[in-house]
């Protein structure tokens, strides 16, 4: 008897209960999240004195960040508060996990404090899945980044940014540049881009920083920066994740910038209206030149702004779906 695989993110009716990965989400589901985010962007842009909606009033959102974060944790906190939720940011270093308590023990204790949603960042790939398997039926889990595996809300806000500036995914060439081997953002972006019908996704980087299997995902691989940037509509730059590297994968940051840094001269090889993105934090002079990061084609700060609305959309959608 064949066992039917069930996506752990979805309810029995196929609705989004947790957001653990973009992989496995349909084009319609991703589009629904982006459309919902548009409504929250309009709320932020409006003249309303109070930019809040009561969607999560009376709900408790626990931000559990086992890795450092500035943008992601802050935007999740702002998003939850704009949805009128009560927000708790757990200080991991001061918590019982630093004294040897297991991850599931921590989750069980926090669940006993009437948590309705966990936003989780963890160094171990799969940690949010483990949590989602063990929480009470009414509790929702959102992956804010797990190891090298996935960063689904970053992927979604990247898609929102691309759609905002380029409108149609089906005629774009998108280049992802840098340390793709260690990047959970790259994996989420690739799954989202291919699901949304982008005809050409390129990966640009040195052989030591590109994972195997990219071609099987429909990605064109380039080791030469100039060749890879020719005629692209979108450039997504990634930082070097030195904290995840084992061994000497690069000669030096200076040599890396010479070969793969995005300079105005290299950006000129892309289409004249190409946009430049970066999930942050940026390392100026390593993967990107300040003239590009602060230039007219950069939409990096737009990504941060849109991230609040996208995370509001995700939280609002999952909170409404239970088995």
Swiss-Prot record:
Protein name per the record: Aspartate carbamoyltransferase catalytic subunit
Pfam families referenced in this protein's UniProt entry, alphabetically: OTCace, OTCace_N
Subunit details: Heterododecamer (2C3:3R2) of six catalytic PyrB chains organized as two trimers (C3), and six regulatory PyrI chains organized as three dimers (R2).
EC number: 2.1.3.2
GO biological process, one term: 'de novo' pyrimidine nucleobase biosynthetic process
Keywords, alphabetical: Pyrimidine biosynthesis, Transferase
Taxonomy, superkingdom: Bacteria
InterPro entries linked: Asp/Orn_carbamoyltranf_P-bd (IPR006132), Asp/Orn_carbamoylTrfase (IPR006130), Asp/Orn_carbamoylTrfase_sf (IPR036901), Asp_carbamoyltransf (IPR002082), Asp_carbamoyltransf_Asp/Orn-bd (IPR006131)
Organism encoding this protein: Cupriavidus metallidurans (strain ATCC 43123 / DSM 2839 / NBRC 102507 / CH34) (Ralstonia metallidurans)
Keyword Transferase found: yes
One Gene Ontology term of the molecular function aspect: amino acid binding
């Amino acid at each position: 008897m064949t066992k039917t695989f069930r996506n752990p993110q979805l309810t029995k009716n196929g609705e989004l209960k947790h957001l653990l990965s973009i992989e496995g989400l349909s084009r319609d589901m991703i589009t629904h999240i982006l459309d919902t985010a548009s409504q929250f962007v309009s709320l932020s842009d409006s003249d309303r004195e109070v930019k809040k909606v009561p969607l999560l009033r009376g709900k408790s959102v626990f931000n559990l960040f086992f890795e450092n974060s500035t943008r992601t944790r802050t935007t999740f906190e702002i998003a939850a508060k704009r949805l009128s939720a009560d927000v708790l940011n757990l200080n991991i270093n001061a918590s019982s996990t630093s004294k040897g308590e297991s991850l599931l023990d921590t989750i069980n204790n926090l669940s006993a404090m009437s948590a309705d949603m966990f936003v989780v960042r963890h160094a171990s790939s799969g940690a949010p899945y483990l949590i989602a398997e063990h929480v009470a039926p009414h509790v929702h889990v959102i992956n804010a980044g797990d190891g090298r595996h996935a960063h689904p809300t970053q992927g979604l806000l990247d898609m929102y940014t691309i759609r905002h500036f380029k409108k149609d995914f089906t005629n774009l060439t998108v280049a992802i540049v840098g340390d793709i081997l260690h990047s959970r953002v790259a994996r989420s972006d690739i799954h989202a881009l291919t699901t949304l019908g982008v005809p050409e996704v390129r990966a640009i980087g040195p052989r030591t920083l590109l994972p195997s299997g990219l071609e099987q995902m429909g990605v064109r691989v380039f080791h030469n920066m100039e060749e890879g940037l020719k005629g692209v509509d979108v450039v997504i730059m990634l930082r070097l994740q030195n904290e995840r590297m084992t061994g000497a994968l690069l000669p030096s940051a200076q040599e890396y910038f010479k070969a793969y840094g995005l300079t105005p001269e290299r950006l000129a090889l892309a289409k004249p209206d190409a946009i430049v993105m970066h999930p942050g934090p940026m390392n100026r002079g390593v993967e990107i030149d300040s003239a590009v990061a602060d230039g007219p084609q950069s939409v990096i700060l737009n990504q941060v702004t849109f991230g609040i609305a996208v995370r509001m959309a995700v939280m609002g959608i999952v909170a409404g779906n239970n088995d």
